[in-house]
């Protein structure tokens, strides 16, 4: 259920874009992201920082898109969010306070150097996705960017999540690997 809630704003954005335009879709994205927060809080009685940051970014850049009637703002949102994720992960790792380890370390007991590898992998992933988004957003047609944002970045994120899980699994202590089988 929680994963479906995470994809709800993206699905609504895509559907509204296909039937209307980027401006109505941007407004729908703001509303859907707000709805996502309300439903998530109602069901789980807490909100993750990532959801709050995403909501703030969607609201700011979506509103700018609507006010100035310029789709560049909603396009930049993707790159800025990815840059913030990369920056947060990188800084946390440099301070030896890995965000990924704090999120998953209780369930997956792997060495600190493995968490560092995973963290830098995701820093690189987010940075590359942000740069590719700039290219696709400002060099290719709007329709291509919407498809890239909805399907391309989602698929790449899922693939990288699977790669990360396999990498972490490979480095789990043997007794913990047996528990997961």
UniProtKB/Swiss-Prot annotation:
Transmembrane segments: 10-30, 50-70, 72-92, 118-138, 148-168
Organism domain of life: Bacteria
Recorded GO CC terms: plasma membrane
Pfam families the record matches: IspA
Membrane topology classification: Multi-pass membrane protein
Location in or out of the cell: Cell inner membrane
Keywords carried by this UniProt record: Cell inner membrane, Cell membrane, Membrane, Transmembrane, Transmembrane helix
Function: Plays a role in cell envelope biogenesis, maintenance of cell envelope integrity and membrane homeostasis.
Assigned protein family: Belongs to the YciB family.
Protein name: Inner membrane-spanning protein YciB
Source organism (scientific name): Shewanella sp. (strain MR-7)
Source species taxonomy: Bacteria, Pseudomonadati, Pseudomonadota, Gammaproteobacteria, Alteromonadales
Gene that specifies this protein: yciB
């Amino acid at each position: 259920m929680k994963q479906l809630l995470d994809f709800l704003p993206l699905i609504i954005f895509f559907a509204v874009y296909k039937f209307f335009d980027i401006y109505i879709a941007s407004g729908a994205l703001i509303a859907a992201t707000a709805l996502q927060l309300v439903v998530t809080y109602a069901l789980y009685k807490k909100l993750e920082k990532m959801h709050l940051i995403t909501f703030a970014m969607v609201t700011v850049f979506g509103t700018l898109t609507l006010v100035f009637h310029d789709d560049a703002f909603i396009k930049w949102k993707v790159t800025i969010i990815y840059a913030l994720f990369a920056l947060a992960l990188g800084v946390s790792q440099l301070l030896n306070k890995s965000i990924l380890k704090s999120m998953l370390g209780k369930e997956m007991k792997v060495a600190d150097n493995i968490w560092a590898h995973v963290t830098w992998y995701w820093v690189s992933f987010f940075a590359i996705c942000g740069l590719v988004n700039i290219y696709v957003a400002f060099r290719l047609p709007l329709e291509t960017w919407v498809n890239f944002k909805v399907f391309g970045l989602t698929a790449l994120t899922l693939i990288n999540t699977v790669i990360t899980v396999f990498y972490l699994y490979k480095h789990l202590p043997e007794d913990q690997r047996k528990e997961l089988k």
